[in-house]
Amino acid sequence: VVEKAELGGVCLNWGCIPTKALLKSAQVYNYLKHAADYGVSLEGTATADLPAMVTRSRGVAEGMSKGIQFLLKKNKIDHLAGFGKVKPGKKVEVTDASGAVTEFEASHIIIATGARSRELPNLKQDGKKIIGYREAMTLPVKPKSMVVVGSGAIGSEFAHFYNSIGVQVTLVEFLPNIVPIEDEEVSKQLERSFKKAGMKIMTSSSVESVEMAGDTCKVSIKTPKSVEVVECDIVLSAVDIATNLEGIGLEETGIKKKKG
């Protein structure tokens, strides 16, 4: 197994697993806010500690990554830390952190290089005010407000998480329904739930531009009726993902991409 970063890949380290850990923290916080509804009395008021939630989420991911490392060792599977590149003749070139290159040969090669946040031309990520999903998992301070662009699985999960811990969230979707690949009745029900929780939903809308005014993001959003400017602390771009296929030797070996 050739891996340049953490074992377990994107899903385990920067996707499904740590996201679900954050959502669990939000769920527990919500339970505590409504403890009396369950016949539970609390002294004081529950507060959402985002840094502590992030620490727990990262700990869950790191623990599972170490579990992958243990399983590889237990099953006598070699782990090569470095960047892999496919070469003609069923060979793989691995460059480690020091720059040393080692070549391996195999009868079968599996390419599973994961994905990253896709950037829109008019929504360039700076990692601080306009962010992708990785930064959304590790924000050091809870923002007061956030615009989430894209309502697929990634956008909807983060919108729900941040809304649940007290952030004013606006969810922007280009298509007529949020979570557009789901059945329409599912989309409508989720939209009702989000609105009931205090989230602002803008469908059939697109972000035209983001301008900075000090620490405030001024997001120009084109709606079916006009252009609306929404001010927020953070813009999360969650429109799509891009595959990590650059520089791994596909062109040199004649391997064609499909939907990549």
List where the protein language model places each region.
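Glycine-rich Rossmann-fold phosphate-binding loop(s) that bind the pyrophosphate
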Residues: 4-5, 149-152
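FAD-site-proximal beta/loop scaffold in flavoenzymes
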Residues: 127-142, 234-260
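N-terminal Rossmann-fold NAD(P) dinucleotide-binding loop
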Residues: 155-156
